[in-house]
Amino acid sequence: MSLMVSAGRGLGAVWSPTHVQVTVLQARGLRAKGPGGTSDAYAVIQVGKEKYATSVSERSLGAPVWREEATFELPSLLSSGPAAAATLQLTVLHRALLGLDKFLGRAEVDLRDLHRDQGRRKTQWYKLKSKPGKKDKERGEIEVDIQFMRNNMTASMFDLSMKDKSRNPFGKLKDKIKGKNKDSGSDTASAIIPSTTPSVDSDDESVVKDKKKKSKIKTLLSKSNLQKTPLSQSMSVLPTSKPEKVLLRPGDFQSQWDEDDNEDESSSASDVMSHKRTASTDLKQLNQVNFTLPKKEGLSFLGGLRSKNDVLSRSNVCINGNHVYLEQPEAKGEIKDSSPSSSPSPKGFRKKHLFSSTENLAAGSWKEPAEGGGLSSDRQLSESSTKDSLKSMTLPSYRPAPLVSGDLRENMAPANSEATKEAKESKKPESRRSSLLSLMTGKKDVAKGSEGENPLTVPGREKEGMLMGVKPGEDASGPAEDLVRRSEKDTAAVVSRQGSSLNLFEDVQITEPEAEPESKSEPRPPISSPRAPQTRAVKPRLEVSPEAQPTARLPSPTDSPSSLPPLPSSSGQASVPSELGHGADTQSSESPSVFSSLSSPIAAPISTSTPIESWPLVDRGQAKSEGPPLLPKAELQTESLTPVPNSGSSALGSLFKQPSFPANKGTEDSLMGRTRETGTEKNTSSLELEESLPEQPETGRQEEELPRFPCKKQDYSPSSGEAQEVPFALSLSSDGAVSPVGELAAGGDRDLESQAGSLVESKARDAAEEVAPPLPMGASVPSIDSMMRKLEEMGLNLRKDQKKTKKRVSFSEQLFTEEAVAGAALLVEGHSSCPQELNPAWSVAGNASDGEPPESPHAEDSERESVTTPGPATCGAPASPADHLLLPSQEESFSEVPMSEASSAKDTPLFRMEGEDALVTQYQSKASDHEGLLSDPLSDLQLVSDFKSPIMADLNLSLPSIPEVASDDERIDQVEDDGDQVEDDGETAKSSTLDIGALSLGLVVPCPERGKGPSGEADRLVLGEGLCDFRLQAPQASVTAPSEQTTEFGIHKPHLGKSSSLDKQLPGPSGGEEEKPMGNGSPSPPPGTSLDNPVPSPSPSEIFPVTHSFPSSAHSDTHHTSTAESQKKATAEGSAGRVENFGKRKPLLQAWVSPSETHPVSAQPGAGTGSAKHRLHPVKPMNAMATKVANCSLGTATIISENLNNEVMMKKYSPSDPAFAYAQLTHDELIQLVLKQKETISKKEFQVRELEDYIDNLLVRVMEETPNILRIPTQVGKKAGKM
């Protein structure tokens, strides 16, 4: 019982006690009334009408000891009332066996006087006197301790507690009969009153004599103050349970649903989460308390005193004047926050949902993203979580990073954070759509800053990237708006994609639109599919592609085969995409996690791979009918461009016939992803190359892609966080919603790569064979790609292709087997040869970026025509040089291929390039389904291809040196080292690399425009010079950054090596000097120079040389010459755009024109190394494939080593593992997270200190005012029985 010293009204000792506690200690000198001078003495304590009797001290010799207490209710001692009411009477009696008890003496104490004189407590001896009117005798003394107490209950409370006390004997009898003890608490006891006993003080010792005699159980009841009032607490607590309603705020539900619906909401949801944790903690606590209490009350009728454990009772209950504080409730609330399941409120569920999406982004959302659009969801989560927790934010950016490379990862993580923050900021004020638009414009502008030509291309976010990607070219702005609308429509899908990111293919679709700005506007309506994909329906995605892009994508495959006789492989490819696409559908659902894990690195490669397939098909088609296929291809490309909006997944994808690819691509990616898990790394490289090839062939798309790529680059360059995303984001940039899809597509691409890669490989090989002598090199590219894919397919197609293009294939196999690097170089070689065509595409893309989109189609046609007939745009004049280049690459890769063969290869490769363009178009249309999935990876690869494009130029120059490239492992190590270096020089290197990449890109573009001849050469020279400048400017940073880029794209070192080699080789044809400038110091290195040597010098060149090296393989010498010329020319035309693109990593990737490069890959064993390096990111899949071709066990070993490298960089966690949420975080993000948690802990510690101080102060006050509360009585007072 809380006793207060001061009544609050009086001062000092002038306070009115409400109770007096009388403890009868002992007596002495009593008269003997029993036998032998003994007496059986007991004392009766009475105040007013209340009496208590002590126990009988039997046979005491005149000095009984009782030490029993009784508590009496006092009238106001300060009021003038009858003295008897405030008089304490102590009577000592002898218990007689017969008759009345004998009187031994009596003492009376005036409590008023005692209180006035002695204050609160007094222990003294009182002399026993005789009854009034009798003669006084010596009766002895009694020692009594009298303590005045104040119970602060209000009068009404006290009255309630005392109300039913019987005042008359009959009432007492009734109470006895009923078993009621006055002492025991009455049923009407108020919530606050501990017990109905008059003695409410904490001591409660002098409650009952009768109780003792009659019922110890009752005494216990009376002693436990709160036992009798089970409802008391529930009563006081009940009101608090109402806050529960607060839990059901529309905002809470809205944020939960909105989170699913769109990123803005997801971020708001995360905000809600954060709010919940802070401000909502109270609500939660209350809610939880409410929930808990209601639950407890439900279980234990209003909860009784047990509610003490409940947060509610503790939070709001004042028990006996003691307040229960919310400290524990808060803790409970926090606990509930962490485990929302405990709270039944929707808010609790929502919170749970939020947590799973944010923290369990890693676990729950990540699982979905892993399955569907890990990256997007990561990103979205990161955005939403940025406010709530770094965890989620980091995860989004981190996930792509691990896939891309440590280097890219770190760069991307910052970028992602920035993008996320920016996105969040824009999203908060604006609606999801407006925010998307603003993000598009804002981020695109940022990207523009990086690469002026492609403002829209920069995907601030994956969504933004998608939207931006649409806008890359002249059409980019319009498509971007359309894409924005579409993204708005599909924002929920995109958001869910980003948040849940279940549908990679979804994003891929969005990405595809970006890929083909011209046709984007029309295809965008098809992009509605992204929503369906949001449900992770890869096939729905395909449906959308066919519906929205049926004319483009489906027609592309159809047209391809019909219009391109050589497209048997193309149709095969188309079928492959379908197969792969369907398989991907199955696999996408089955192995979403694989997608997420492989998505980043493999996605890009896969995209490339698909293009490669198309290229090999093109080779065949070209061999059969180059001119016609080219036109159909161009048409297909155009159509494909139209569908691209739907595909949106990848400019390359659209270039490759994205129309049919978008959904299939996703499926393919899924299937391939699984297949690729083993051979993914190798496959990825080859796929990347392939993708690049198709990309180049379809200049028109590339045009759009180019702007888009710059966007990607911008995104990529802008922030490392975004950069991580960029691999996908790049893809997204190109393809509207690629980012999330990028991840999914990446994962899916892997699967697709495996399947599509294998199919395409076989087809490409067939095409290469059809292409004949020129294809030896060119075919070698397809064969390498095939090798990669076949490796995916367990070498089935590879064997065929190997047989067909045994020279190239075996060499590439040897290269891969002997050196994963060599294999990569070969792939690069293939790319190099194809990049020539791609270069035209890039050149056109650059031009388109500058506002020459038409040129891109023209370049495309020209490319094809120039393949057939050295035309103005493509390889016309450079046709022989291109072929020659290819041959030199082949010669380097394969000594056996003669220069003359290279010459013939020149023409044929050029044709093949044209045919490839046509086939690529057709294949793209068909592959566009899985390309849609690959599209994101393609975009990613395009990012790589942006880097590669310059690399392609460099490759054209240094292709021969590809064979000397280090092994895959070495490259990986180098890339990792470079990545580390780049991370150190991250920003500078990035800028340098991007710039160089842009220049390289420009160079690459000119390559495609070989047909332009001298003008192209001049452009390329200009670009080469620019590249040289860029590379020279940032040779160190560039080396680091290119290495980083290469690491990111797996092409850095390879293309470097190739760059030097190509540079030298190009000098042989006509662009040696020009190529050298492109190489940026790589030119001087001999063709045999290992990629590693060039790596430091021409980082962008490295990247692009890898790509170019493939085209070089196909058109090694010729390509070099033509590349030099056309690159010069294209450099002049697209120099600004390319520089911009290069400034942005995405543009560099765009420059990557994998398709051309892909074919020559097998042509050059040396190139394989460069390619592998180039594929560092993609390379892993390529290396795995190449190794597989030569040696399945070797391929497995390579894959394992590469996987181990990845795992070393990032330990893999199961999505169900709580650590998964943090596994994707970058170092910086982890640091931020730790700092944030530290801050939170410090805040909590501060709160704890405050509470502790409060408790200490409270204790001090209690000790000062009511020390008896804390005092443990030395003598355990017995309760005197009530009479």
From Swiss-Prot:
Its main location: other. SUPFAM superfamilies: C2 domain (Calcium/lipid-binding domain, CaLB), Eferin C-derminal domain-like. Residues 588-612 have a biased composition (Low complexity). CDD domains: C2_Rab11-FIP_classI (cd08682). The keyword Protein transport applies. It is found in: Recycling endosome; Cytoplasmic vesicle. Residues 161-281, 330-727, 741-782, 835-913, 969-993, 1037-1141 are annotated as: Disordered. Coiled coil: none annotated. Gene3D superfamilies: 1.20.5.2440, C2 domain. Residues 1211-1273 form the FIP-RBD domain. It holds the Pfam family C2. The keyword Transit peptide does not apply. Residues 257-266, 975-986 have a biased composition (Acidic residues). Changing Y1254F: Does not abolish the interaction with RAB11A, homooligomerization and subcellular location. Reduces the interaction with RAB4A. The modification Phosphoserine is found at residues 184, 202, 206, 234, 300, 315, 339, 341, 343, 345, 356-357, 382, 435, 477, 529, 545, 758, 1135. One of its GO terms (biological process) is protein transport. Residues 1219-1283 are annotated as: Necessary for interaction with RAB4A and RAB11A, subcellular location and endosomal recycling. Interacts with RAB11A (GTP-bound form); the interaction induces RAB11FIP1 recruitment to membranes. Interacts with RAB14 (GTP-bound form). A Rab11 effector protein involved in the endosomal recycling process. Also involved in controlling membrane trafficking along the phagocytic pathway and in phagocytosis. Interaction with RAB14 may function in the process of neurite formation. The FIP-RBD is involved in the interaction with Rab proteins. This is Rab11 family-interacting protein 1. It comes from Homo sapiens (Human). The lineage of its organism: Eukaryota, Metazoa, Chordata, Craniata, Vertebrata. The gene is RAB11FIP1.
